[in-house]
UniProtKB/Swiss-Prot annotation:
Natural source organism: Bacillus cytotoxicus (strain DSM 22905 / CIP 110041 / 391-98 / NVH 391-98)
Subunit text: Homodimer.
Top-level taxon of origin: Bacteria
Protein's name in the database: NH(3)-dependent NAD(+) synthetase
Gene that produces this protein: nadE
Broad class of enzyme this protein falls into: ligase
Keywords recorded for this protein, A-Z: ATP-binding, Ligase, Magnesium, Metal-binding, NAD, Nucleotide-binding
Entry annotated with the keyword ATP-binding: yes
Amino acid sequence: MTLQEQIMKTLHVQSVIDPKTEIRKRIDFLKDYLRKTGAKGFVLGISGGQDSTLAGRLAQLAVEEIRNEGGSAKFIAVRLPYKVQKDEDDAQLALQFIKPDHSVSFDIAPAVDAFSNQYKDLLGESLTDFNKGNVKARVRMVTQYAIGGQQGLLVIGTDHAAEAVTGFFTKYGDGGADLLPLTGLTKRQGRALLQELGSDKRLYLKMPTADLLDEKPGQADETELGITYDQLDDYLEGKAVPQDVAKKIEKRYLASEHKRQVPASMFDDWWK
């Protein structure tokens, strides 16, 4: 088995999908896991990007089906901007499409800035822009878990195969969640699900960005990765890609294994 084939298997990627079937499977997963845990619903941060839009709509459909079947469940969508988000219009468009039971907005700037200032006072240096970006992601995680813990809700994560293969998420930030309904999907497959669900094109054709950096606001994921999502998707779907691209992907995959595992102990062998 080649490393490419091993990665596809490990990340549960299918070369070809049927969007309707995938939507059904993922809604059922959300419903089944919610019932198994006894939680009261879901909470998810909505950015206005493809991934949270898709996960949010699946979550809302899941809780609506549970209620129609005589159960009780709710979904809270959370806006988590740092000050004013330049693409707030996209976030509002996403919320209109998702139609969540409840929507709230938390400005994470006061918490992030207070921590950053205290860090500088105590340690005599400023956080790098990169590390401050990770603080933003982790404050967003803390906010979602505060809501979830208070109201008995599960935190949904938006990780998918193209992020998982590169480790392109913040450990214990956007990587911190209770369940991952987009697991196994490539970026283009996620777009196909949104198309099937009737999303506005603007939401799934939007340039993907983590938007965590103050010095490079709105920087494209592809710029930071040095790999395009089309290349990642081709690789993950078992297609041939240029050798240098395959090497970049595989290097990132191997280097980010710790992000896909629970914290290492001396009894584990995955890190050896």
